[in-house]
Regions:
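Short hydrophobic beta-strand segments
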Residues: 1-8, 55-59, 104-113, 132-136, ...
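Metallocofactor- and cofactor-centric catalytic cores in central/energy metabolism, strongly enriched
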Residues: 5-66
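Adenosine-phosphate binding glycine-rich loop
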Residues: 10-12, 17-23, 31, 179-235
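Structural alpha-beta junctions
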Residues: 20-25, 48-56, 68-78, 124-136, ...
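Short acidic, S/G/P-rich loop/turn micro-motifs used as interaction or catalytic elements
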Residues: 33-37, 63-66, 112-117, 139-140, ...
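A glycine-rich, Thr/Ser-enriched phosphate-binding loop motif common to dinucleotide/cofactor-binding enzymes
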Residues: 75-92
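Glycine-rich phosphate/diphosphate-binding loop of Rossmann-like nucleotide-binding domains
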Residues: 97-162
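Rossmann-like adenosine-cofactor binding region
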Residues: 151-201
Length: 235
């Protein structure tokens, strides 16, 4: 069961639990006493949600009390699997933000092995970028051969001597990445320079966008193709 922690409003003294649906996703909404978050109020709300079977929760953007929620047995909704499924849109958003046309771009894919998400990213990117650098020790050569047969020359073995505009990391970075780095590894990738939303329509504002999209995607309520990605770099 997934929960949703939100402020409850002025004058409320008790935790209030309400079943709700957000874009077809059933949630147990935990309304924190009062109009704002405090550590004590969040602990009370998290404890109540956990007693009702909740193990992971959504919360507003920049929610400051994950430690208090974790102490009661709650964790954020995992976003890593969705981020890896969105690797190609993330790459194209990064190139667009940097003003680099995909047909002129070299993009590196790095990982310990060829996973389904890495393979799908390669198949999506290879036809549209100038060069795709596949830097994967386990299964990388077989993937490069598949891409060469289907698309021709763009897929090659990467390495320190080959420049890249962007490196997509499907496993933790090892210090050999070039250009911009999008670390998609782990359960909760940190992608503060990217924005995620619906290609059509709007998300509710009382839950952080990426975890909500991930919960919807995991539940089969939307597809990766219905998610829009943009990038906003400071430098």
């Amino acid at each position: 069961m997934t929960g949703h922690i939100v402020p409850g409003g002025e004058g409320r003294l008790l935790v209030r639990l309400v079943r709700e649906q957000v874009l077809g996703l059933p949630l147990l909404r935990g309304e924190v006493p009062g109009s704002g978050f405090t550590a004590r109020r969040v602990r009370r709300t998290a404890r109540a949600l956990r007693r009702h079977g909740v193990t992971r929760v959504l919360a507003p953007e920049d929610f400051p009390f994950w430690g208090e929620a974790a102490a009661q047995g709650l964790r954020p909704v995992e976003t890593g699997e969705l981020c890896r499924a969105l690797a190609a849109p993330i790459a194209l958003a990064a190139l667009e933000a940097d003003g680099v046309p995909p047909r002129l771009a070299a993009v590196a894919l790095r990982g310990d092995r060829v996973t389904r998400s890495l393979r799908e990213a390669a198949l999506e990117l290879c036809p549209v970028v100038r060069q795709l650098l596949v830097e994967v020790p386990a299964g990388g050569e077989a993937l490069r051969q598949t891409l060469r047969r289907e698309f021709g020359l763009p897929a090659v073995e990467g390495g320190p001597g080959r420049p890249a505009h962007l490196t997509l990391c499907f496993s933790p970075p090892g210090g050999m990445e070039r250009g911009r780095i999008a670390d998609l590894s782990g359960d909760w990738p940190a992608l503060p320079e990217y924005r995620f939303g619906l290609a059509e329509g709007a998300l509710p504002e009382d839950a952080a966008a990426l975890p909500l999209l991930s919960a919807l995607w995991q539940a089969g309520r939307l597809t990766a193709e219905s998610i829009a990605v943009t990038a906003h770099f400071r430098t």
